Regions:
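Catalytic phosphate/metal-binding cores of nucleic-acid and nucleotide-processing enzymes, i.e., regions
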Residues: 2-84
Length: 84
């Protein structure tokens, strides 16, 4: 199991924390696996803020062009998260 440090814009971090968003659409270039940890760090004006979350990947959707998911991208699902 690995930890993937990723940038996230504030509006999308807000949606996770306040509006129940439980997925991320990402380039599938890091070898994501169910059970891995996402470390989503908020970025603003080109730098990191002190806000973010960690979450365990519980589902991965890949290679579904019939539903509009382009090759090379994936949707990462997670249930629970911890605010940093």
């Amino acid at each position: 199991m690995r930890t993937h440090e990723l940038k996230i814009r504030g509006i999308y971090l807000f949606d996770i924390i306040c509006n129940g968003k439980r997925f991320e659409l990402r380039k599938d270039d890091r070898g994501f696996e169910v059970g891995d940890t996402l470390w989503l760090r908020e970025v603003m004006d080109g730098g990191y803020t002190n806000r973010g979350i960690t979450a365990e990947i519980t589902y991965i959707l890949r290679d579904c062009p019939e539903y509009g998911l382009q090759k090379g991208y994936c949707i990462l699902g997670f249930d629970r998260y911890d605010i940093l």
